[in-house]
Curated annotation (Swiss-Prot):
This is Protein LMBR1L. It comes from the Eukaryota. One of its GO terms (molecular function) is transmembrane signaling receptor activity. GO terms for cellular component: endoplasmic reticulum membrane; plasma membrane. Residues 1-21, 88-114, 176-196, 327-350, 410-431 are extracellular. It holds the Pfam family LMBR1. Residues 1-76 are annotated as: LCN1-binding. It comes from Mus musculus (Mouse). The gene is Lmbr1l.
Amino acid sequence: MEAADYEVLSVREQLFHDRVRECIISILLFATLYILCHIFLTRFKKPAEFTTVDDEDATVNKIALELCTFTLAVALGAVLLLPFSIISNEVLLSLPRNYYIQWLNGSLIHGLWNLVFLFSNLSLVFLMPFAYFFTESEGFAGSRKGVLGRVYETVVMLILLTLLVLGMVWVASAIVDNDKASRESLYDFWEYYLPYLYSCISFLGVLLLLVCTPLGLARMFSVTGKLLVKPRLLEDLEEQLNCSAFEEAALTRRICNPTSCWLPLDMELLHRQVLALQAQRVLLEKRRKASAWQRNLGYPLAMLCLLVLTGLSVLIVAVHILELLIDEAAMPRGMQDAALGQASFSKLGSFGAIIQVVLIFYLMVSSVVGFYSSPLFGSLRPRWHDTSMTQIIGNCVCLLVLSSALPVFSRTLGLTRFDLLGDFGRFNWLGNFYIVFLYNAAFAGLTTLCLVKTFTAAVRAELIRAFGLDRLPLPVSGFPRASRKKQHQ
């Protein structure tokens, strides 16, 4: 063989080795996410649904749980996609010729974006509908009972649903862009209609993030207050613990000896009062065991961090609104080649990239908190070892819709300069200036409104509790005469 043939062969071998390495890394990453999601879901599932007398129902629920685990792993991968890309770019900038990070390149990042897009489509369009129909199916009338009969019914229902959704997508695409849609045929399902369907789902997810994130940003203060020990300047914990113990003992005596009182007792009300006192005593014990810095510094520092992150998010969005009016390059767009390691995606360098990653995770957590805090989706909130299979499927679908829209959401708000890779940048509505501008303005306005309304009331209430003014019998200052008249009467 000549030297040129050896060079061609070595290039082909290198490409083959790179491809195998990318596949191994992708499999290891997804396997790790899958194991974590499986452990997470097993903590919320109902054990009774998997240990029933009917082995058929238990088998169906196990199969549906594995499909939900796959979907939740894809959702977690979509959340980590943009932060992982930003961090990879900064690592390649800092260590451009390091031998041990040669595996971290643009081809790997681009492949991960394509895999997340593919698995998101697969989960939303096929796997989750299959899991729902599979758990609700009983087999066709007259057919043999068993898992196989349920599979046949589920496949038929899934085919009918696919035809219905495909027809709706074709009609919608023809209405929106009739010239282009008229040239497409059913043979272009994978290249045109499926990305168009995912574009609609992503737009729905972005709108859902627009509603849930401001609500979640306002709720994060109260949620953090429940998790941390709040400072109380004027309180005696020992006195409160003794009072709570005495009240609990008195109620317990009433429950154990109902005949000692000549009035009829509401046992259900007494049990609720005992449970409330026990919960209050647990909180007081937690406050007593907390250290001084936890009681006095932990909660204020956490509130300060939340306020800084929220204010920084609103400030970045406000600056991005001005950039949209001045520079066309601020519009979100996609790129086909991941040019990593050439320039930082933040003007502040690595520090700015870290801030971008922190803000992306913070907004995602806030959107999940706002999603479960909303009255419309509050019934989907998972409960520890008490979540039905239908609720698990609904939670996985909603979390996948939110997480798959996170890269588009972050780029639309200008939280990062990292352009969307692969099919994520093919969404038609991303190029519409009015949609992007109104979205940024609505996010900034809603977030500011929720914070001003919630934070001021929360600060006022916490200051009153911190100084112990809520336990003082203060008279109503606005109506002194009216109160005196009522006392005389």
